[in-house]
Amino acid sequence: MFKIDEEKCKKCRMCVKECPVHAVYYEKKDKGAIVEITEKCVECGICKRVCKFGAIENDAPLESVITCSSCPIQCKVPLGETGACTRYRNVGGKLVRDRELVVEALEQKEAADNIKKPIITAVGAGTNYPCSKPAPHIVSECRDGVDVVTVVTEAPLSYSGLVIKLDTNTYIGEEGDPVYRDGKVVGMVNTEEYGSKMIAIGGANRLTGDNGFATARTIVELANGEEVELKVNKKIVLKLKAGVAPVIDGVEESIMRIGCGSATVGLFAKRMKDAVDECIVIDHHVIGLCSEHLAGEAVGMTWSGIIPNATKSSRGRYFGGHGSGIGGTSLETPRDAIKGADMSIAKAGMQVMVVNTTGEIYALFELKADGSFDEIPMTEAALGVALAIQDNCQRSMTSILYTGGTGGSARGGVCTHPVKITEAVHEQKAVLTIGGAPAFVYPGGGINFMVDTQKVVNKAFTWVPTPATVAPVEYTMTVADYEAMGGHMDQIKDVSEYK
């Protein structure tokens, strides 16, 4: 377990706040305070990582602890306690999942099949304004013996924007960095997803701000499948178009990463072991070191003594710095990924492979007796590792998701009790589609949705100078439910008038 060096401890209580198993005891005294690490400690290392004063030290290990292997941290779990994740408990000397397996999933509300697709789309429907007027087209047909109605309108939405997903590891800036169109801020870099960079464009505040017209135009052009050039921090140039690979600073992306560096080791540890003595996988999120990784241990490897040029997180997993280098890191060349070697463990002649998470950048090095490294030609086995990574990567693509909120006055064109259509959408009694495409409706109040623009009818979006974007909105439900919410029954037309 760990202990606290009283001379170094400043009683800041950061370790107390962050310990996931509440193993750090704090008591305020008349003269100072007591901070102690109790026998609940699982050696997860959080206290060491948050202590700015180096006051956390290793102590003698407790008896009857079990090392957990369910994640890279490898908690030392005392009898009767759980590890840092609180999932596994030491019960009588055996680690047991602290919750029974749940077999039955929660029941979900699902719309009936006969209302999942609109009878007609709203593309080209027009808008009846003000919104107290019935929607431009209210159309019915009989499906499976049930009368169904679709209400359509092209709704101006000031609450609208885009979520852009770029399948790339290439550095495009930090979260929150401004995104420009023709010198005007139209969005920002968002929190990234696994294997993809994310950008947010628009939103109500940007649409009503000084750059609202540029923002509306950008949303619509991207949503309609046009190519648009954006800049992050007025430096990094992005050429984006839905359904094709992003172009970043003039370089077209080809494939997206197979996973982070740790995941790549986990997937190919056996192949790496058979090919080389060590493999470093470069990634901006987690750099993998095969021999030290638990996946390397699982195939019979022990730490090679090779030290990667990154900050250690846990066994075989290291954090690299963000930058314009390989895999979105600050490493410009494969050689930069090797910091050095512990020659008390490493042996001259060792072959060290460095590869990125798409398998497109790779090199092989040989360790010399003086601790230096010489690059050598790739062996067939080492090249096989890189090709295996490449073969398991997906094509890089730009995805454009349109987001909007239709919970305002546009509901007046649907019915005379607007809250009823909102409730019906959430109860799956009415299905919202956008240009014929299924939409994800956010939980909670209102009708806030997200839709994949590649599934929407082509060129379906426009904008008005209020400014706001205009989206084709369809609501489909049974005629009985429509009447119950105060629908405009006298405006219903049979589908035969349209087809």
UniProtKB/Swiss-Prot annotation:
Residues 1-29, 31-61 form the 4Fe-4S ferredoxin-type domain. GO terms for molecular function: 2 iron, 2 sulfur cluster binding; 4 iron, 4 sulfur cluster binding; 6-hydroxynicotinate reductase activity; metal ion binding. Optimum pH for the reduction of 6-hydroxynicotinate is 6.5. Activity declines rapidly below pH 5.6. Its EC number is 1.3.7.1. Binds 1 flavin covalently per subunit. One of its GO terms (biological process) is nicotinate catabolic process. Signal peptide: none annotated. Pathway: Cofactor degradation; nicotinate degradation; propanoate and pyruvate from 6-hydroxynicotinate: step 1/8. Disulfide bonds: none annotated. Keywords: 2Fe-2S, 4Fe-4S, Iron, Iron-sulfur, Metal-binding, Oxidoreductase, Repeat. Gene3D superfamilies: 3.30.70.20. [4Fe-4S] cluster 2 binds at C19, C41, C44, C47. Pfam families: Fer4_10. It is an enzyme of class 1 (oxidoreductase). Its cofactor is an oxidized flavin; [2Fe-2S] cluster; [4Fe-4S] cluster. It catalyses: 1,4,5,6-tetrahydro-6-oxonicotinate + oxidized 2[4Fe-4S]-[ferredoxin] = 6-hydroxynicotinate + reduced 2[4Fe-4S]-[ferredoxin] + 2 H(+). [4Fe-4S] cluster 1 binds at C9, C12, C15, C51. Homotetramer. Catalyzes the reversible reduction of 6-hydroxynicotinate to 6-oxo-1,4,5,6-tetrahydronicotinate. This is 6-hydroxynicotinate reductase. It comes from Eubacterium barkeri (Clostridium barkeri). The gene is Hnr.
